[in-house]
Amino acid sequence: VKSSNYPLYGDMSSRVMKIIGEYSPVQEVYSIDESFIDLEKLPFNLMSHMQSLRQHVKNWTGIPVCVGVGSTKVLAKLANRIAKKYPRFDGVFDIDELPYERYCKLLQSVEVGDLWGVGRQSAKKLNRIGVHTSYDFYQSDVGVIETLLGVNGKRIHQELYGNSCIPMESIPPTRKQIVSSRSFGCDLKDFDELNQALTNLTRKAVNKLNNHKLSTTTITVFIYTNPHKKDKPCVHLSKTIGMTSAIQDQSQIIPLVSQILRLIYKPGYSFYKGGLVLGNLAKNYQQQDLFSMNQNSPSQIIECKKSNTIRSVNSKFNESIKYASELGNNKWLPRADFKSNRYTTSWGELLII
């Protein structure tokens, strides 16, 4: 069993997504290992086109992928499930080519909770009214589904009939919040150790904020004790503050996170997890507080330039500049005794042949 290696995973994911994007003019990167592409109106044989995609990804990255083809997102996800499960389809399956009788049999073999978009809680609601399989869901009255699961449930139901209701999002929607959290390598009691961890997590969150050209007006900080240790009390501590004007500068956000942590910190407890949430996100050009005397002051402009310089240096030289509160014994870092090398992102860990 290997420890997590997020730099390698992220880099390989971006390589795979770039290759997939070459096979369609419209691509939606759904997650680190999933992507939707629009195949409509392409002047190719879809099956051979997708086999070429699979081979391209395999040859250039060594990663095997499967492709599900369908007229809607829900059908494409269902087709992908079949492509993975049955080797005879050679990694590509077009669900729209199934005769109706076989399509119904397929739905009967898939539990409703395994449908894309139907979560665990929604599946429990459906089970209570006798809907256990995807076929039961398919045969259910759309009005009942909408009453039980809302408009999202209705969309999933309609997509099983081939009616596209969940559009492609080639431009990701604006984030509503950014969460940065971590289970620590060992339980932390000392405030400075917690502050070191939170400062590091804050800088990562602010980097995401800046990469998406967003700003925030609310900050939530939380720390938890380990709920699995039955001999000790389970404590969840958190606090949210709001600002009158949006901020995006790490020189402003890091001190605020430290202040919030000091407000909620309780000596004597051992905390195993912590993090922060940057909420109420908006584009950087949002209207500032008209009554603030400090906006665009010389000191603010200097701090902003300083932070931009630090971020630029860190992006080029592997996070070489750190805040004082980030320095310490690093006890909070997750254990990575069995981590594989960062073969594609670190000069010192290149694969030696």
Each language-model region and where it sits:
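Gly/Gly-Pro- and Ser/Thr-rich, intrinsically disordered tail segments characteristic of DNA damage-repair
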Residues: V1-Q158, S297-I353
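DNA-contacting surface of Y-family translesion DNA polymerases
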Residues: D114, K124-F271
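A glycine-rich phosphate-binding loop feature that marks nucleotide/adenosyl-phosphate handling sites
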Residues: S71-V74, E159-N163, S215-N226, S270-A282, ...
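Short, well-ordered secondary-structure micro-motifs
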Residues: K77-A79, D231-P233, Q287-Q288
